[in-house]
Amino acid sequence: MTEATGIVGEFLTLKEGTDADLLAMQCGDFYEFFAEDAEIVADELDLKVSQKSSHGSSYPMAGVPVDDLTPYVSALVERGYRVAIADQHETENGHAREITRVVTPGTHLETGDESAQYLAAVVREASRDSGDTYGIAATDVTTGQFQVTQLDDADAGEALTELYTFGPAEILPGPELRNDDEFLDRLRERTDAALTLHDSASFEPGRASHTVREQFGSETVDSVGIGDQNVAVRAAGAVLSYVEDTGVGTLAAVTRLQAYGERDHVDLDATTQRNLELTETMQGDSSGSLFDTIDHTVTAAGGRLLQQWLQRPRRNRAELQRRQSCVAALSEAAMARERIRETLSDAYDLERLAARATSGSADARDLRAVQETLALLGQVADAVTETERLAESPLADALDGADREAADSLAAELDSALVADPPGTVRQGGLFKRGHDDDLDEIIDEHEAALEWLETLPDREKERTGITHLSVDRNKTDGYYIQVGKSETDAVPEKYQHIKTLKNSKRYTTPELDEKERDVLRLEERRHDMEYEHFQRLRARVAEHATLLQDVGRTLAELDAFASLAVHAVENDWARPAVVDGNELSIEAGRHPVVEQTTEFVPNDLYMDDDRQFLIVTGPNMSGKSTYMRQAALITLLAQVGSFVPARSATVGLVDGIFTRVGALDELAQGRSTFMVEMQELSNILHSATEESLVILDEVGRGTATFDGISIAWAATEYIVNSIQSKTLFATHYHELTALGEELPTVENVHVAVDGEPRSAGSDGDVTFLRTVRDGPTDRSYGVHVADLAGVPEPVVDRSQAVLDRLRDDKAIEIRGSEQNDGGTTQAVFDLDSGQFRDGAAQSGGAAAGSTAEPVATDGDPEHAPGEAAAEGPKGDERAASLDSETEAVLSELTELDVNETPPVELMAKVQEWQAELDDE
Ligand code: ADP
Ligand code: MG
């Protein structure tokens, strides 16, 4: 068949011209996939493959009916494919087909998912002096949101964090990032986004700037301050051009350019978001996350907003107080709150409806949903004004954010146009009420009259003919007909013309019926066309109001989010925290917001300020150290969301960032060594945290040998205390670190108290702990203590203690303070053996020195450290005398080997080699 050749050929040509993964090409009433595409689609979607022959070869073919395309495409896109759609249209000489739309993960309008769906672009430029500048733009085509930011002098980590926070479905890397494998790898580690190489030209500054100004207007671009942010503009331009190219048709709904800077938000890196389990648990479940726990929103948009708040806590005190006041008012006005939530639960997703109206995919039911939701604004506004507690709160202002008059008038317009319960298809009439348009009314009247005539025809005919089994119906082949039961066919009047005989009946028509049929068909077609035209006009009216819809949608979403926070606060007895400037963090009877849901939680206090900047948290395993620290981080975070917090009372000094290093179990799965990851994260914290940050370190150093670990933990503590000065909580099982708490002025020890007489939890003999946090360090040998409590035999416990003492033998560490604070570098020297301080530069020498054996090394006098000398062992020449030449050789190789420069595998090989050499003797 030559026609077949044509179709497959055309398919392959179109496919060549697109970089989409799959092509669906319209062929009459079907969309067809051919060749390889057919096989992929059939596999993914369980479609049947048939064969299409062309040029003597045969091609696999799979198709879906035109009306069913959307769900199939959605399913493919959700599996990560980019699907091009070629529509067919009539031309003078037959059909022509062209690609009208490419549906991609980031431009997928018919998503079944309520959460935000971001398409992001990221670009990088090397800046003159130091570091790089990253520009990121992200849009959600389903809601018209558009956000841009520029990160100056940033390392890739900050850009990756931004992208992680958006969780985009699709990312367009700029031309300069496409070959940066390291960046791309790290990107893939953090997101599941599809990476798409969009036309490089659209990233060019001139072109991008033009695109952005066209979209938002030059004034807007300048007023939000991205006009001179070249890098941000490049990302924004690329995103807009991609949305345009894919043909999703929602650009008109993208009306608001939101530019945000680094100073607006609390810095939360990807690790911290994961560690604090903000939106999903470490295991990757959304249930059990902070969001899942506190989310009581009743609308999809409200849920999206609340989630966004959690991921982007704020630093602006006025904004936080505004939010708190709204939550406070709603938590007190219980009746009004429930009335508002009840009302909101009828709301549809206005932001998404705006995008559907703009893209031309909204049907009459969607416009009805718009109308019904717009009408809710008035209802909730009434609930606010009628309730004194709410009326005097900032909620009243929040509601003014949306133009109520415009909303009412659009709602009224839609209400007077559309019938109450319109059909799901827009091409078959029945959409409009009478009175919408005179000409339309006339056609509707005529049409209905004709239908009425047909409807009453059976009764008239029965009466006239006396036939009882008579009906009038319609089908595709016969048109309208009169059907008479077999037993009564003898009685039919003469003018009945027989058209068909069935088993139990005969069908007839009459000249009159034929004429009415022609009328009805003509009127029907006319009516459908007219209604469709009017509908398109009405939909365009709604699209013109996209901004209004978004405003109202966001106002309702905000109200929903506030009400949700209020519900959670009331139900869980949370308190409104004081948000203040400065470094205070005080929490009275604080709880962990997620753990308190499932456990009888033992509340704890926390106090930190300038003089108590760094807390070392000690206590046995499973005593609650990690929980206590996360609780501090989550309470700070919630306070900076504007929420109430799980505590009797709290004062939270606003932070610029929260950094955590908690647990390591999940990282093993990624094939990176736990310790490497631990150190990378520590490194990131030490680079990024400032004196306004909150840092949570949980068991840092645990991933390596004990003394290695202590050393790193020790040095990191000194560095944070002396150089960074962030508010820090450090849980450690290295009891040695508590020495720092006793010596450095801003470092304090707290411990989770272990009950002397352990309470037995039930009959299984589990040891339970008190979990109360108190000042001071924990019992130094709690590990052994726990072994004892758990009933390990006495000889083992005793021996453990002895071994521990031996291990700590003869070790001493000096403690460093900062120059300006302490007038000297060395603060004290801690003897790990005795658990006592020896001498130190800043210590008042005499008494302390007298109580211990000898003075040990300080910074000022490193050469003559007696400890070191002792550790060196026998002097060189003595050693030479007692060693054979092989051993000498091994030793000298060992001395020369640069451990840091030698790959671990080589190191192992070396060690084996040496062992073999030494064995030979
Ligand atoms: P650690 O870090 O000291 O090993 P965790 O913080 O992991 O201990 O806590 C151990 C267990 O105790 C967890 O199951 C946690 O839910 C529970 N827990 C911790 N703190 C409390 C508390 N204050 N009240 C009740 N249960 C707690
Ligand atoms: Mg822990």
Curated annotation (Swiss-Prot):
Q: What is this protein called?
A: DNA mismatch repair protein MutS 1
User: Which positions does UniProt annotate for ATP binding?
Assistant: 619-626
Q: Which UniProt keywords apply?
A: ATP-binding, DNA damage, DNA repair, DNA-binding, Nucleotide-binding
Q: What does this protein do?
A: This protein is involved in the repair of mismatches in DNA. It is possible that it carries out the mismatch recognition step. This protein has a weak ATPase activity.
Q: Name one GO molecular function term.
A: ATP binding
Gene3D superfamilies (UniProt xref): 1.10.1420.10, DNA repair protein MutS, domain I, MutS, connector domain, P-loop containing nucleotide triphosphate hydrolases
The biased composition feature labelled Low complexity covers 840-853
Q: Where is this region: Disordered?
A: 837-887
Q: Name one GO biological process term.
A: mismatch repair
Which family does the entry's similarity section mention?
Answer: Belongs to the DNA mismatch repair MutS family.
CDD domains in UniProt: ABC_MutS1
